[in-house]
């Protein structure tokens, strides 16, 4: 009995001894979780280093991972303690005191300088300064007082930023990585900032080079900070990026890079705004209080159409220019993504968003694309795959241009637009092609479409005339009789192949529309009527010689063919049926060559390439891959060749990289997407190109508010644009043209003529001027645009949306006859 009791006591003691470390672990784990919870409260916080270490399964990295975990655990504890000190009973004496720009500069070393600007480095604080000599303005790559900032972020708790958030804001770079393990297959949900990396600085005569070693993520890269005459050029070459383990079994790959995400960040006391490239352009005021909304995040040049979304993508305007700006008072910083711009996202956020206290805008580069699909039809089993075989883009780069007003007044939106226009002139070859005293009415005409028809009870899919060549001529005659002196016509779907949605590269007018003789007659109709026979070879319903769907369809990252889905308007899911094949960009060169040969042989002087000017795609085939960057260069080469052989190169919308090579651009938006975080729209795109490229608005009759679209077009210096068809709406029903239900010419020719005559009298005199100032009244109803030209007096045009008038100098134009239904307040 005694022995049994003794044995029970020993067993109990052993069990208790074994449980004690477990209890300690539970307490430790709870503390660590609390610390990590505080860290994750900050936006875009990195994964905990313990997780990172656990994720790194390589035995060779075990010691590094363990060391990183220990360091990060200690850091998390310090952060938690610092946060507790910051947000509870810390006295004023214990708080970090703010410093001035001059005091911050005293901690820096001058690296290099030009006649206009100087570059300084504060290596200890991982911070650079761009100093503008003329204005004395300091631009810091991260806020100098981030540690002292006591702005209340959590209004419920009355607390300021967490310490982890402060460290992220002070970082000079950030990355995201893709986890290739089969059970993960995800991208890091938030950036990993450079405060989690080992950073080494090297100085040279042009600037500095920073090496960022993300040990736990297995990524090492170099970022160059080069001072040029009027800008700071920050770039990273892909051949200087090292990825330690890219194994598809247990590796990690670099997927995104951010340079200086808080360059020029403005604190909660600052007044100013940011410009984002959404649609026509939009303004985000500093500290606008929209903290509950998502920050601005948009892919420049639109999404990659090779990846086919599982559900319908949201309907937004496109960002056509890789440019951002932040402005305070008489100074601003214009940021241009100059390298790798085909794979960049524009970001902006205001104080209070994501639990941080600054207003900032920045670019995020995508180094690898990804794609998602579901296995076995199970919508819960989503698989993500990342682009293989290295980083295809050679360089990622941003240029930061400081700009100041000449007279000390507040910087205008047009001043920032001028910076980007000069960049296009000096770096991309943009030249002035706009004609003086010229105003055109832009009209899109649609030739033919396939339509299901029953003959003797047997269904046939037949070519159907929508606007034949003679009918197009009749529409133009009506417009001319109404007083329209100059017309630019974009004629769509006028060959048999284009009507059938096949690749069409030969000038072969469809007999269904009237044949070659009627086509030739239309083309040569009137010297003041510019007819552009366009071909859109972006996708195809079926193959043709040289462009078979089996060999000429773009391949997705997932190794599937890229078929462009149509989506249910009600549910947003892909509709069943045959989806058009996306033409591989490897065939674009053939398309450009064949079209140009055929157009020049037929002595046509105008050409258009449809979606090539606005949509960028990739091809991830193993044999001949094409990244978005390579596709962009192919498109640029094609448009450049066209500009050398054809006098009129027409763009149906235009990303910035084609602007140097086109003479006319239609479908220039007058709105942004209206993201909640933005405050109002501006015609930033128009400010960049006015006086250099002729352009027209989106179709007036397509807009849900045609009156406002007309007035905004006038205020932004845009020509008027209409969609027109000869056939009635019932003919368009159940065809690819059913969304043109509004376009029958009979209902629009009178209004179009009236609007053209009014716009021509107001704008033709400034057609070759640049926009040098744009102002909005407090209620946003009066829009005032200043046009300037060397050797001429400025012309100021004000458009009053509420009263439907336009004022040029002292002359007031009544726009009542240009308004279809009147405007409401």
Residue ranges, per PLM feature:
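Bacterial N-terminal signal peptides that target proteins for export
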Residues: 2-12
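Bacterial N-terminal signal peptides
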Residues: 13-21
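Sec-dependent signal peptide cleavage junction
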Residues: 20-41
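Active-site-proximal substrate-binding groove within the catalytic cores of carbohydrate-active enzymes
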Residues: 114-133, 316-318, 326-360, 366, ...
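Aromatic-lined carbohydrate-binding/catalytic grooves of carbohydrate-active enzymes
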Residues: 436-524, 528-588
